[in-house]
């Protein structure tokens, strides 16, 4: 059972977050348990996590703010193990370094900053930049399969749906291009083939004409000359 001081503190922090949201961070308490908070970290531009949306949970002890919370991440990210507590100076891994003045926003800001780092810690993993980028690209789709995420962060679900519609529209616009290109190629081939056929046909026609007899006027001339030659002896008589 959470202490009254803990409940009042968390309610106050939630109101502060709603009034002054933290850049790249969204956090909300569970409707049924104010000790369990759900968060989304947005990957910073210029990092392998750019475009990623990383969902996780913060579990506060009833003694908060005098004791630190436990922090886990649900979304595969390439930096931290999923469903495993992350070792931070602001988490229950290090109660000796905890400061009661720290808040939910400062915890998540610190987590986001540490996520961009490469320092190893308990609960961290070592992956390539390409792997982190791949996970960032698929993060929103992964999150939208989680019922708690869909319930607590409807704006991100809407964002995912809009992305899907945009991708479908792009696919529909680009798909007809391939048949058109094929048709153009076929038409081009058709244009070339008749020309080739005409060329071959013309060559055959010329050969055929060459094989035909002499023109008619030449034949008539030859017949006339032949007739005159044959008539010469008769004229001498």
Swiss-Prot record:
A GO MF label: ATP binding
One record GO biological process: negative regulation of stomatal opening
Active site: 87
Domain UBC core, residue spans: 5-162
Matching Gene3D superfamilies: Ubiquitin Conjugating Enzyme (3.10.110.10)
Pfam families xref list: UQ_con (PF00179)
InterPro entries (UniProt xref): Ub_conjugating_enzyme, UBQ-conjugat_E2_core, UBQ-conjugating_enzyme/RWD
Location(s), subcellular: Membrane
Enzyme Commission number(s) from the entry: 2.3.2.23
Record carries keyword Transmembrane helix: yes
Domain of life: Eukaryota
Compositional bias segments (type: Basic and acidic residues): 180-204
PROSITE patterns recorded: UBC_2
EC class: transferase
Pathway recorded for this protein: Protein modification; protein ubiquitination
Keyword Membrane: yes
Reaction(s) catalysed (UniProt annotation): S-ubiquitinyl-[E1 ubiquitin-activating enzyme]-L-cysteine + [E2 ubiquitin-conjugating enzyme]-L-cysteine = [E1 ubiquitin-activating enzyme]-L-cysteine + S-ubiquitinyl-[E2 ubiquitin-conjugating enzyme]-L-cysteine
Segments traversing the membrane: 214-234
Keywords: ATP-binding, Membrane, Nucleotide-binding, Transferase, Transmembrane, Transmembrane helix, Ubl conjugation pathway
Membrane topology: Single-pass membrane protein
Family statement drawn from the similarity comment of this UniProt entry: Belongs to the ubiquitin-conjugating enzyme family.
Function statement: Accepts the ubiquitin from the E1 complex and catalyzes its covalent attachment to other proteins.
Protein name as annotated: Ubiquitin-conjugating enzyme E2 34
Organism, as annotated: Arabidopsis thaliana (Mouse-ear cress)
Gene: UBC34
């Amino acid at each position: 059972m959470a202490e009254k001081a803990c409940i009042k503190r968390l309610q106050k922090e939630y109101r502060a977050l709603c009034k002054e949201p933290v850049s790249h961070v969204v956090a909300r308490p569970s409707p049924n348990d104010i000790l369990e908070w759900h968060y989304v970290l947005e990957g910073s531009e210029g990092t392998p996590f750019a475009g990623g949306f990383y969902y996780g949970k913060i579990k506060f002890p009833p003694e908060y703010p005098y004791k630190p919370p436990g922090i886990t991440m649900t979304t595969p990210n390439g930096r931290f193990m999923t469903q495993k507590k992350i070792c931070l100076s602001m988490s229950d891994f290090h109660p000796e370094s905890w400061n009661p003045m720290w808040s939910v926003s400062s915890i998540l800001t610190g987590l986001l900053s540490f996520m961009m780092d490469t320092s190893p810690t308990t609960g961290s993993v070592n992956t390539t930049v390409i792997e982190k980028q791949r996970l960032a690209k698929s993060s929103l789709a992964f999150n939208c399969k989680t019922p708690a995420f869909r319930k607590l962060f409807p704006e991100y679900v809407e964002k995912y749906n809009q992305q899907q519609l945009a991708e479908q529209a792009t696919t529909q616009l680009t798909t007809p291009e391939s048949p058109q290109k094929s048709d153009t190629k076929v038409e081009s081939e058709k244009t070339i083939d008749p020309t080739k056929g005409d060329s071959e046909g013309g060559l055959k026609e010329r050969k055929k004409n060459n094989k035909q007899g002499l023109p008619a006027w030449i034949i008539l001339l030859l017949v006339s000359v032949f007739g005159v030659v044959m008539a010469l002896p008769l004229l001498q008589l």
